[in-house]
Amino acid sequence: MRNYELTTITRVSSREVTKSEVQDTLNKFSVSVTADEDWGQRKLWHPIKHEEQGIFHHYKCSAEPSAIEKVEKEFLINQNILRSMVVRLDG
């Protein structure tokens, strides 16, 4: 298992629904979340999918690389997730 940081930007209009969808996706692929930070609502530098603001959420987690690939694909399909970024941590 490797350690990752995962950041998502979600639609303001579906804050709670999207948060539970993200948690369900992580659980579905056996991603172990070690830390969970809500960075709150922020103005976006430029509109993403016609949205001017987004909810930023940051996770520290550990998982197999294949599970992270599947999570990223699920996030691309989800219309409520505007952007996501996964970074592998050293060690």
From Swiss-Prot:
GO biological process, one term: translation
Alphabetized Pfam families for the sequence: Ribosomal_S6
Xref: Gene3D superfamilies: 3.30.70.60
Molecular function in Gene Ontology: rRNA binding; structural constituent of ribosome
Keywords: Ribonucleoprotein, Ribosomal protein, RNA-binding, rRNA-binding
GO CC annotation: ribonucleoprotein complex; ribosome
UniProt record similarity statement: Belongs to the bacterial ribosomal protein bS6 family.
Known role: Binds together with bS18 to 16S ribosomal RNA.
HAMAP family per UniProt: Ribosomal_bS6
Protein name as catalogued: Small ribosomal subunit protein bS6
UniProt source species: Leptospira borgpetersenii serovar Hardjo-bovis (strain JB197)
